[in-house]
A protein has these predicted regions:
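Sec-dependent, cleavable N-terminal signal peptides
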Residues: 1-23, 443-444
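Sec-dependent signal peptide cleavage junction
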Residues: 15-27, 412-420
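Disulfide-bonded cysteine-rich modules in secreted/extracellular proteins
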Residues: 26-37, 233, 309, 334-344, ...
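Surface-exposed loop/turn motifs in large extracellular/passenger domains
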Residues: 40, 57-70, 84-99, 106-126, ...
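Extracellular, surface-exposed repeat/solenoid domains
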Residues: 290-302, 309, 356-379
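C-terminal low-complexity, Ser/Thr- and acidic/Pro-rich disordered "stalk" regions positioned immediately N-terminal
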Residues: 380-416
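A cross-kingdom C-terminal cell-surface attachment/processing module
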Residues: 419-441
């Protein structure tokens, strides 16, 4: 029996080790240096392939699956995009799509085209953008979208020219969705004509660098459900049209805000930003959200922020301050309750909340004009303006007879129960009011 079990386990392990190679389509066509056009079917990149005939181009109407095999790298022909999609493209695998030329993208998704990214790293390994006014002689978006793109977990998009004397992107954005200037779309030498909006859905992945990590531009529609976004230059998300953020982690380690929102008009630059969830961290003293003017306010219904965002909280949505020096702001009833339940002190700065299962020792401070219940107790009003601390429970006492005799000939003592207090480490970033950015949007 033991031998049979060992054999079965060995077979299971072998299947697991082979599963990656089995995932490769044996009928897939190998992409070579001279491959230029992809028609219906499956293709695979193995090893390092530098294109010589031009961009790897998906034909209009074609349904193509492109696998980036482990360790593979697809590099552009000088002066060309690496991949141009005019059809329906799905990319899988763990390899890399790179672009090393000025003004060229690793992936260019044309108007009307659809791309689904299920894996791979997309890079500009010679990115040299030095500042908003200096492209360093080699800069562009890593991905440019005029069609529809869905990004799923397992994808990495970056601008990392540091190994080649470059930068992580300070001139061009990393991922651009929509038109830079839709008023000139379709004109000779300009961006393609606008027939339908550019749609970008991000379900996960890692996005690093760029002047703006994700730029939602003219006629762009952006939805972010999850992902990790890091920026050191300007903003993690820059929006001028329609953006909905439902989750993800966003970090800005430079001297600007995590999010930026601006409205230009009611047609293609609506400046509509809705934030339902996510964690947004800027440097100490830097606002998490910056807006161009009062017409550009986002609508915040959830999330955790490193600065005060109550001015953007939709309607009566509650907001609480917590963490060291109350530098973290939590938005939404359920999120605030979770923080207090985890053992954090909170100050309710806006709205009405009902907190339940808050452990002993936690202090809740009701702000002016708020209505706050803690474990069923109404602490609203001036009586608790300095805070209400949840008292220790009287505990539960029960007697259990025992015949056990201890070494000192005494019986076992009664037992008591004391609910412990969970510890939670909050964000420790100091909030600061944002300075409105009123200049015309920088290229990218």
């Amino acid at each position: 029996m033991k031998k049979a079990l060992a054999t079965i386990l060995a077979l299971v392990m072998a299947i697991g080790l082979c599963s990656v190679s089995w995932a490769t389509d044996p009928a897939a066509t190998q992409v070579t240096e001279t491959t230029e056009v992809l028609d219906n079917g499956s293709y695979i990149v193995n090893g390092e392939v530098t294109l010589t005939g031009g961009a790897l181009t998906v034909k209009p109407g074609a349904a193509v699956t492109l696998e980036l095999a482990a360790g593979s790298k697809l590099t552009n022909k000088a002066g060309s995009h690496t991949i141009i999609n005019n059809g329906n493209l799905t990319i899988t695998g763990t390899g890399t799509v790179d672009n090393v030329s000025h003004g060229c993208a690793a992936l260019y998704n044309a108007p009307g085209a659809t791309a689904t990214l299920n894996g791979g790293t997309f890079d500009r390994s010679h990115e040299a953008g030095a500042s908003t006014g200096n492209n360093g002689g080699n800069s562009y978006y890593t991905i440019k979208n005029f069609g529809t793109i869905t990004v799923n977990p397992g994808v990495t998009v970056q601008q990392d020219g540091t190994a080649n004397g470059g930068t992580t992107g300070k001139y061009s954005s990393l991922f651009a969705n929509g038109w830079y200037d839709i008023t000139t779309a379709g004109q000779p030498g300009k961006e393609p004509a606008h027939s339908s909006d550019a749609v970008l859905v991000i379900n996960g992945g890692t996005f690093k660098g760029g002047l703006n990590t994700v730029k939602n531009d003219d006629a762009g529609k952006l939805t972010i459900n999850d992902g990790t976004f890091t920026n050191i230059a300007q903003h993690a998300v820059f929006n001028v049209n329609e953006a909905t953020i439902k989750g993800g982690n966003y970090t800005m380690s430079g001297n600007d805000s995590v999010l930026y929102n601006r409205k230009y008009d009611d047609a293609n630059d609506k400046g509509q930003m809705t934030i339902e969830n996510g964690v947004f961290k800027a440097k100490d003293g830097v606002p998490a959200i910056k807006i161009a003017d009062e017409n550009s306010k986002p609508s915040v219904t959830g999330g955790t922020f490193s600065s005060d965002v109550r001015a953007y909280a939709a309607g009566d949505t509650p907001v609480a301050a917590t963490g060291e020096q109350e530098g973290t702001y939590v938005v939404g009833q359920s999120a605030i309750n979770a923080v207090a339940k985890a053992g954090n002190n909170v100050r309710i700065v806006k709205g009405n909340v009902t907190l339940t299962d808050v452990p002993a020792g936690v202090t809740v401070i009701p702000g002016e004009g708020t209505v706050v219940f803690v474990n069923g107790k109404d602490i609203s009003g001036n009586q608790y303006s300095d805070g209400y601390t949840v008292p220790q429970s009287s505990g539960y006492y029960y007697y259990q007879p025992t015949t056990d005799t201890k070494t000192d000939n005494t019986k076992g003592s009664p037992k008591t129960f004391d609910a412990g207090i969970a510890l939670y480490v909050g964000m420790a970033l100091t909030s600061a009011a944002g300075v409105a950015f009123v200049g015309k949007k920088r290229e990218d």
